[in-house]
């Protein structure tokens, strides 16, 4: 038979090539050794524990927020209930005070202002003109003169300041 190369011969030749090749060409694989496996597994476990811890922490924060919102809602409801129950008592107290007290009750200012505004005359005439002195200060009202419009003095009519610098 001629030269037939069997599969076993090829495997043995490959093993010889690998054993004679330079070992520095093969990169270091930490997972190939025992302590490398331990290191990789430890790192993976630490990452998983960290993720679980962060999820648990966020869940606790969410629960606290929900609990505080419920407590706030309960206090608002209890305050509202107290106000409703005390409003009847306060109305009875006000009625009692009205019957026995001599002092008038407070009325809101808005009602007084509306009543006062209704009593005022409504005209579209402007106020009478006024008299001003040289300094622009109010002196008094001008006697009514038909068609005369008095204006305060302008700055142009004031005397110019004198410079005493020599």
Swiss-Prot record:
Disulfide bonding pattern of the chain: none
Record keywords: Membrane, Transmembrane, Transmembrane helix, Vacuole
Lineage top rank: taxon: Eukaryota
Cleavable signal peptide: none
Keyword Manganese attributed: no
Disordered, as annotated region: 73-93, 123-166
Main subcellular localisation: membrane
Transmembrane region(s): 34-54
Gene Ontology cellular-component annotations: fungal-type vacuole; vacuolar membrane
Subcellular location(s) per record: Vacuole membrane
Keyword ATP-binding: no
Membrane topology: Single-pass membrane protein
Stated name of the protein: Uncharacterized protein C630.04c
Species annotation: Schizosaccharomyces pombe (strain 972 / ATCC 24843) (Fission yeast)
């Amino acid at each position: 038979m001629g030269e037939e190369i069997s599969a076993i011969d090829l495997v043995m030749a490959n093993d010889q090539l690998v054993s004679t090749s330079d070992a520095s060409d093969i990169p270091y694989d930490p997972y190939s050794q025992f302590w490398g496996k331990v290191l990789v597994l430890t790192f993976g476990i630490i990452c998983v524990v960290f993720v679980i811890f962060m999820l648990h922490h966020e869940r606790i924060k969410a629960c606290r927020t929900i609990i505080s919102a419920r407590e706030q809602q309960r206090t608002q409801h209890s305050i509202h209930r107290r106000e409703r129950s005390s409003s009847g008592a306060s109305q009875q107290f006000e009625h009692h005070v009205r019957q026995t007290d001599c002092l008038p009750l407070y009325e809101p200012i808005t009602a007084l202002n509306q009543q006062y505004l209704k009593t005022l005359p409504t005209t579209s005439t402007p106020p009478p003109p006024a008299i001003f002195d040289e300094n622009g200060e109010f002196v008094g009202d001008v006697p009514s003169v038909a068609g005369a419009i008095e204006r305060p003095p302008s700055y142009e009519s004031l005397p110019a300041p004198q410079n005493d610098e020599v």
